[in-house]
Each structure stands twice: as C-alpha cells, then as structure tokens.
C-alpha cells in the first residue's frame, strides 16, 4: 500500500510538472504577442505634444485626491503575462492616510509604481483602467493616459514617493545637497543655486535632521539608515506635493527609529494638508497610522474599509489570518501562526477565489467563480462567499424580526 502511494505521488508530481511546462514554441509565440502589445502601449506613452484634453478627466468625488478605477497593471514576460495588479479600485480621500497592506508579491508596490508611472519598462505596463488624480490647480488627470514628458511635470511636484530602500534610492556618487537641489531645479527652472540650497537645508530641518548644513555636504554612505530615510522624506517634501506615497518607509530600521519616522510622517501630513498612501506588510504600522485600509492578495483587493472596520470586524479569512500572524507578548512558548500554502502562480491564475486553496473556512460555493465584492457597510467591502452567506443570513434574520413586529 505504501509503495502504491509513493508511486501515485510520483505520477501526480509528473502530471503537475507537465501541466505547467511551456514549450519553446509557446514561449516564442508568447514573446511575439507580448512584443506587439508592448510596442503599442509604448507608442502611446512616448507621444509628444499631446493635447491636454486627451488625458483630462473628472473626479467621481471632488473630496478624493486619487481614484483607482479597475486598474490593470501587467508585466509582459516570455513565459506569459504576470497580472501584478488585476482590477484594483479604491480611493485616497484628501487629508487622509490610506494603508495598503498584504504579503510580498500581492501588488501593493506595483499599484503605487503605476500611479507614479515608474513601472519597469518596457515589460511593465498599465494595461487598462483609470487612475484619476485631483491636481492642486483644480484639474483632474487620468494618469494612465498622461504621456511620459507631461508625467515628468507631475511626478515629484504634485505627487512624490518615499522608497523602501534609501541606500539604493540615493545616488552614492553625489552629495545629499546636490540630489535635493536637483528636484528644485527640475520643477522650478528660475530658482538660483543659493535659493535651492536654502530650501534644501530648510527641508532637512523640517524632517528633524541634526546639523542640516553638515548633512547637505555629505555623501549617502556617511549617514545612518534613519538619516538616509529622513533625506528621502525631505526630498519627497521639497515641492510641497499633494500626495506622498510611502513604500515600506520603516524597512530595515530599528523600532525606535521606526517610531520616529512614523511620527514624522503623521506630522508632515498635517503640515502639508495632504494625503499619504502608506504601503506596508506591517499591520501594526497600519493600525497606528491609517484612516482607511486596503487589503490586497495576488493582485486583487479582497477587503477594504476604515481602519476600525478592518481591525474590529475583519470579514475575509485572509485578513483574519494576517491579524493572527501578528506576534503577541502573551504567547509564551506557543508557535507563531502562519497562513498555510502558497500564492497561486501569477502567470496562470485560477478562475475561482485566489485564496481558496489556503483557506480554512472554505466550503462548496468557493469552488465556483471568483466571488463578487459585497458591501458590508457604506465604507466596508469584501470579496468572499463566506461573508456573502453571513450577510444574507443577517438580512434574513432582520426581515424575520420586522415581520414578527408587524
């Protein structure tokens, strides 16, 4: 019996390998088709002297600074199309912090790179959907249609990004001052070197940098991790942006410096009267900082709502699993909780719920098509059959109570 089981396992493994095997001919065909798509998309991006009317749009709600509407951002590889962001829709209201959370590879960073139009070219492309941006001048831009030369005027001035690795984001051969001044020269052509230096030193003071004049003259390798991150924040603030995207801003920093950076971001949001899109896998950071939370899994949003709704009343089993994974001080010698299984192959995603094979709440309905998004409250939504069943039961019981009163 044991011999038969081992043989069956080998057969199943072989079938699995054959199922995902891609022949040279298939790779060649895929590469050819992807090359055609990339060429067409790049042609659109590289157009010059495009009339503004082509990428002007209207905000669905004027109180939002950004609206992601059915965004699809793909990577066209020889092995196939990686759907890194697959139909993402959410808003970033003015004067708020929206936290985007999920494990590595869920698409949260690609979402932000699509907003900044910094996806790795030529493979990385915004394939479809809209990203509506509410500019400081009152105009609304569809970022997905803004040509490259016009995007250079928006990026850095209207919206800026704090990257997760300051050591690799800063140029090691230029002094800090040169890198800060460069942004000002780009967006304010009439500024003098003396004015740029004064503004850069002021920004270093704003982010709490001790001896800003000294830091201005140093190279990145002469600064600590926390100091480099403060430089990145100063750089992001240089042009008084409407929106700051903070991608894992506390990565590789010790807890004390992490707390300082988070406090700094919170105070900056109030000072500039702007919004922050905070990307992290750390639910503790999200709980402390965010007004609204978007939970992503395998390129899609599985749950979103206010921070209170997500933490007090999580509806999706993945969100529950993420919360259970947070280490607690009272665990004693218990094992830390982990979500079993792995994320599906991004090139060959299933047509059912992406979390199904890892879910401990799975039932018959989960074998059907990908679940639709349902509203739990005006601000809380989830894509899950279990939540759908619970909502239906609650609605039925409420109807029963009403009929009983009659």
What do the predicted segments below correspond to?
Residues 58-64, 140, 213, 306-406:
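Short catalytic/signature loops enriched in Gly
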Residues 1-74, 374-406:
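ABC-family P-loop ATPase nucleotide-binding domain
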Residues 245-249, 253-334:
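P-loop NTP-binding/switch modules centered on Walker-like glycine-rich loops
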Residues 137-160, 186, 309-314, 344-350:
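ABC ATPase NBD coupling module
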Residues 218-223, 227:
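Conserved ABC ATPase signature
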Residues 238-242:
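A short, proline-enriched helix->beta-strand linker immediately N-terminal to the Walker B motif
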């Amino acid at each position: 019996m044991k011999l038969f089981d081992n043989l069956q396992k080998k057969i199943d493994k072989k079938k699995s390998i054959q199922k995902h095997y891609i022949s040279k001919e298939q790779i060649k065909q895929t590469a050819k088709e992807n090359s055609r798509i990339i060429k067409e998309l790049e042609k659109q991006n590289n157009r010059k002297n495009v009339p503004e009317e082509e990428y002007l749009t209207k905000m669905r709600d004027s109180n939002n600074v950004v609206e992601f509407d059915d965004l699809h951002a793909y990577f066209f590889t020889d092995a196939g199309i990686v759907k890194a962001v697959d139909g993402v829709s959410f808003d970033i209201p003015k004067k708020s912090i929206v936290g985007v959370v999920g494990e590595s590879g869920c698409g949260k960073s690609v979402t932000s790179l699509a907003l900044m139009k910094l996806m790795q070219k030529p493979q990385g492309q915004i394939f479809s959907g809209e990203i509506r941006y509410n500019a400081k001048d009152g105009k609304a831009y569809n970022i997905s249609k803004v040509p490259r030369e016009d995007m250079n005027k928006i990026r850095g001035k209207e919206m800026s990004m704090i990257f997760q690795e300051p050591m690799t984001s800063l140029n090691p051969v230029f002094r800090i001052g040169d890198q800060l001044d460069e942004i000002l020269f780009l967006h304010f052509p009439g500024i003098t070197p003396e004015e740029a230096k004064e503004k850069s030193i002021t920004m270093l003071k704003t982010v709490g940098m001790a001896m800003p004049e000294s830091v201005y003259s140093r190279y990145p390798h002469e600064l600590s991790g926390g100091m480099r991150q403060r430089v990145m924040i100063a750089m992001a603030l240089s042009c008084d942006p409407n929106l700051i995207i903070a991608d894992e801003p506390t990565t590789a920093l010790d807890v004390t410096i992490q707390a300082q950076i988070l406090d700094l971001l919170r105070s900056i949001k109030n000072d500039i009267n702007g919004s922050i899109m905070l990307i992290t896998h750390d639910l503790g950071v999200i709980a402390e900082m965010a007004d609204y939370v978007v939970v992503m899994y395998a390129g899609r949003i599985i749950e979103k709502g206010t921070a209170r709704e997500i933490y007090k009343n999580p509806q999706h089993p993945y969100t529950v699993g993420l919360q259970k994974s947070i280490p607690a001080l009272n665990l004693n010698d218990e094992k830390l909780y982990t979500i079993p299984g792995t994320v599906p192959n991004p090139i060959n995603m299933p047509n059912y719920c992406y979390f199904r094979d890892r879910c401990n709440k799975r039932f018959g309905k989960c074998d059907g098509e990908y679940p639709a998004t349902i509203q739990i409250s005006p601000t809380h939504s989830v894509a899950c059959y279990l939540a759908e069943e619970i909502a239906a039961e609650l609605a039925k019981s409420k109807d029963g109570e009403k009929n009983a009163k009659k």
